[in-house]
Amino acid sequence: MSETFFHLLGPGTQPNDDSFSMNPLPITCQVNDEPSMAALEQCAHSPQVIALLNELQHQLSERQPPLGEVLAVDLLNLNADDRHFINTLLGEGEVSVRIQQADDSESEIQEAIFCGLWRVRRRRGEKLLEDKLEAGCAPLALWQAATQNLLPTDSLLPPPIDGLMNGLPLAHELLAHVRNPDAQPHSINLTQLPISEADRLFLSRLCGPGNIQIRTIGYGESYINATGLRHVWHLRCTDTLKGPLLESYEICPIPEVVLAAPEDLVDSAQRLSEVCQWLAEAAPT
């Protein structure tokens, strides 16, 4: 058989197409992973910290907390070795939260690589006030802080400014949904609207600053800031290659992208059980 046929196709056999392009794969994609068992083997730890993990795993296997509730174990009194062991085991997942509390303390919350498990630490200055491991759709401090903001009144509307296009009707739409919980969740997608910088400034003045900042990672990054209005969040999604992807106002108790799904909690309970079993088998006798 002639070899000519086999040279009609393949690399280098076709003319270049200058118009061809391919979107590069996102370089910011991160997914949950298993804890490094090799690293855990090198971490000294006490039976106390293993008992805490077993307690949380048992609670989670018996009962999945409903929205607004969590299961928790206290880590505040762990020694330095146990704290390092917990840090190695939990790692860092996709969601980070920072909350400025009314008493001038600050809550720092990091989702673990076990989706729906949250490391919750509260500090005042250099002093650590709380250190907990929580299991739930969202950490308790976030649920509590998200319901403390103001409800709107008509007097909240800031005076009009030059350059407004859609700011005023968007403000009325936003306030109408905040006042009516049955109309939530609701999203106002600024990316798909003709909107000016004056509109953005007007809406920002309407909502005011909040005390919660959230960052999520995955395909790009999302920055979600609470506003001064209850259940109103300003969301910006970016991609390191393409820049801004989405800007919106979300009217809801907590944006869905932050929440762990029930099936995530089931999976994390199973994975945590496997880790606890491995630790028990690896323990010296």
Swiss-Prot record:
Region feature (Disordered): 1-21
Keywords associated with the record: Nickel
Gene3D superfamilies from the UniProt entry: HupH hydrogenase expression protein, C-terminal domain
Domain of life of the source: Bacteria
Protein family according to the UniProt entry: Belongs to the HupH/HyaF family.
Reported function: Not known. Could enhance the incorporation of nickel to the hydrogenase.
Protein name, as recorded: Hydrogenase-1 operon protein HyaF
Gene source species: Escherichia coli (strain K12)
